[in-house]
Amino acid sequence: KQATKIDLQGQKMTWSAYDGETSWTRNQMTMEPEKNDSEANKNMKNIAKEWPSPFLNYKEKGFTVELVGKETIDGTETFKIKVTKDPIVRDGQEQPNISHYYFDTENFVPIVQEEEIKEGPMKGQTVKMTLSDYQEVNGLYFPFSQSSQFQSMEFKEFVLNPEVESALFVFPEGK
């Protein structure tokens, strides 16, 4: 299960949720919740396997990991790692789902993640996510700052295995 809650201009809401079978998200224009189609549900099931990291138990997830080489990113020497995950389905066709991570060779944490955009007006272009401000949470390290050319996100906290009401994941009928 997975849910994203946001605070948008002082209004707290569940932006999207996935209960293990069905996913939904809010329409960015109307802010109304909309159920996703079966293709999006299948993709969500695959994407949920990536949490908290595609590297954690990657073999059991069916992912492959390959060292591509070393590269310098903004003056930092990194290991470039290719991760091949479950395919994404778009318009009934499976498409490769590959990410590249750049791990700092001193601290062994990813500082950049690159992925190809699969749909929309930017389809085929690469999005580069910069990961920083790593903090330890229950023995795992999480980047509390993530930024790309499109958006920046600062996280206040990561809570692992919290008690969560199952209603959080349910599509809000009639709202």
Residue spans of the language-model regions?
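PEST-like low-complexity, intrinsically disordered acidic/proline/serine-rich tracts
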Residues: 1-17
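Short hydrophobic/aromatic-rich beta-strand segments that constitute the beta-sheet cores
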Residues: 2-6, 24-27, 67, 83, ...
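Short, surface-exposed beta-strand-loop junctions and turns on beta-sheet-rich folds
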Residues: 9-12, 31-33, 119, 150
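Short, functionally important structural connectors and interaction interfaces within domains
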Residues: 10, 55-57, 156
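Flexible, processing/modification-adjacent segments and terminal tails
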Residues: 17-93, 120-123, 130, 164, ...
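Gly/Pro-enriched, hydrophobic low-complexity segments
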Residues: 74-172
